[in-house]
A protein has these predicted regions:
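A short beta-loop-beta micro-motif enriched in histidine and acidic residues
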Residues: 48-50, 61-74
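A short, N-terminal "cap"/entry segment at the start of jelly-roll beta-barrel domains
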Residues: 2-6, 14-55, 100-101, 131-138
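Glycine- and acidic-residue-biased ligand/ion/polar-headgroup-sensing regions
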Residues: 69-88
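Short histidine-centered beta-strand/loop micro-motifs
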Residues: 64-69, 86, 111-113
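Short acidic-glycine-tyrosine-enriched beta hairpin
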Residues: 58-59, 88-105
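Ligand-binding loop in jelly-roll beta-barrel domains
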Residues: 91, 105-129
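Short beta-strand segments in beta-sandwich/barrel cores
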Residues: 63-65, 81-85, 99
């Protein structure tokens, strides 16, 4: 009987340690963005939509999951590299001076796969009173 207690204790300790490590790894998600919003205001000729301009700082290993917006989005990279992926297409690396356009509803994501921060300016024209983004359907 004593011969079984020690191996059982070792196995139990291993299971507990693995569970704790798994929870810690799950909690350490990729860093998110730091946004600085310059303005958001209604469009003069269409008050159901609004235009906004913001600066985004993305830390190394930062990024987001696939998502979509209720409007159009333009991005211009100022510093670092931003890996931009439209769902189902190959990723594109944007560098300072590069820009891109995402039409309404297109599923996409941005990531900083480098070891340096990335900064970009983003202009959006979205439907007013709707969430700025929604997770892509599975």
């Amino acid at each position: 009987m004593n011969k079984l207690i020690i191996p059982a204790a070792i196995v139990a300790t291993g299971i507990i340690a693995a569970s704790a490590w798994s929870q810690q790894a799950t909690q350490q998600a990729a860093p998110k963005f730091q946004n600085k919003r310059y303005f958001t205001m209604p469009l003069e000729k269409d008050p159901t939509r609004e235009v906004g301009l913001q600066s985004v700082l993305m830390p190394p290993a930062g990024g987001n999951e696939f998502h979509r917006h209720p409007g159009d989005q333009w991005t211009a990279v100022q510093e670092g590299e931003v890996t931009f992926t439209i769902y189902g297409k190959p990723p594109v690396v944007l560098k300072p001076g590069d820009s891109n356009y995402v039409p309404r509803g297109v599923i996409h994501r941005q990531q900083n796969l480098s070891d340096k921060p990335a900064r970009y300016i983003e202009m959006r024209i979205f439907d007013k009173d709707k969430p700025a983004s929604e997770a892509a359907p599975n």
